[in-house]
Amino acid sequence: MYSNKENINILTSLLLEWGVTDAVVCPGSRNAAIVHNLNDCGTIRCHPITDERSAAFYAMGIALNTKRPTVVCVTSGSALLNTAPAVAEAYYQHVPLIVVAADRPQQWIDQLDGQTLPQPDALNRFVRRSVSLPEPRTEEERWYCNRLVNEALHAATFRQPAPVLINVPITEPLFTFDVAELPKERRFRMLDSEAALTNTTVEVLQQELYQAKRPLIVVGQMAADSFGCSVFDINELSKHFVVFAEPLSNSGETIHFDEAVRHLTAHPELSPDYTPDYTIYIGDTLVSKATRRWLRQTQAPSCLITADPLHASDPLMSLRHIVTCDNANLALLMPMLYDIYTHCDLHTNDEVAWRNEESRTMFLNKWKSLLSQWANHAAAYEPEYSQMAVVKYFEKLIEESAVCVNTHYANSTAVRLACIYANHYVWCNRGVNGIEGSLSTAAGFSLTDHDLNVCIIGDLSFFYDQNALWNNCVGGNLRILLLNNSCGGIFKQLPNLHRSPVADTFVGASHTTTAQGICAQNNVEYIAAHNQEEMQHGISALLTHKGNSPVLLEVFTDA
């Protein structure tokens, strides 16, 4: 029987999944439940050593000989510090030493309790990864615990090995052993062992896609030149797979998956026909929160394609596979993914394979139809005078224009509107999603670019970053489309916030400020629009104005 502590059981299960066969264990009460599990699982050989300093070196010696990750398990407090000499040696010898340290709950650190000290950073300089496990009480916390253990063991064994620390807080009572079986835990797996993309990796990834009945490819934010300045790859990929890509993703067009996912969320009876069973994730963050939430709920196994596999993220809470591929190789990888349809000799032509292909085709056609419906809806819908109407008209005008325009969208409402109407690449500070610095980033971009650069920005973001104009550097190729609805309008979309009496003044930051004075003091041409006609004339002027000074169009709306 195993411990009733869920974090200990998750840890034990994953140690087995990652091939740990030896653990050096030290005496102590706080780590006793961990030692019990290691011994009880029947696969890990436990070697009892009393002195923690010696024990850590014992574990390093085992790892040197077996070339496998090896655990040293210690109790809380100074016992962990005693492993430092061996950890430092393992760091410089590149040995996968797994330090598992029991700990008091976080709330009792530095509270004059026995055998306590801040443990997670105690070995910081000499471990590649240090994690402190939660004591899970919800499914999200279970996922977090699983993810942390996976991240630590991945870091310990990734290419050139290194020591790691797994800190395990344990709440009393400590010694209840009534769990019959360890949980079956999800493990991250590298599909490649080399830094460069290999044929073997591609074949394994192709096989995963070929076995899937409902494969999905998600493309998050990417650099503008990720595909060699070509949008061919994503467009071609969309002929064979369902692809979720935004204007920040180098897609070259708007794929209206956010609206489609919201529709499926509102009609859950439709969702099973559209739910993926394997997802490939490329790039960074998605703007669409609704899509992230929906994909996490589907729990379809996912593969992350990343240039930084050591710091692999799990955005869909279902990571199974990791593939190393930098931006330079993405243009090579994309055709290889749909190559499975043109080289069927790689696979057996049995009945199961044909059924899978039939299911994939049906899944693809269903999504094409749904995405087409929402694309037609977006094209046909004529919003009343509002920020949406402004962005739709702006995007229509630059699409019809022969002028080369780089568009920079600020966060919040602006970039979400871009995801509805922009059929080109969009720059946005989406890494942290902050409202500060969007205008400064666009202005800096314009200094080293000869084309027109337009920053579409909301009022709070603009006034927060108005010092972007407080210099003599910016020139006539910077244009600003300011969407001023006198508040942080995006907060009005949050459910139930309107019930709070402070929603407008304290949260939404209602104001009556305009940009006219800011423009006057910073030598920026100023245009104002208060209705549909003025807005359309203003956008035309914004894009066609000739001069050496920046131009700002401030569009006042109620929504």
Residue ranges and their predicted role:
Residues 82, 219-303, 307, 312, ...:
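Glycine-rich, anion-gripping cofactor-binding loops and their flanking helix/strand elements
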Residues 148-151, 155-211:
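Conformationally flexible catalytic loops at phosphate/diphosphate-handling active centers
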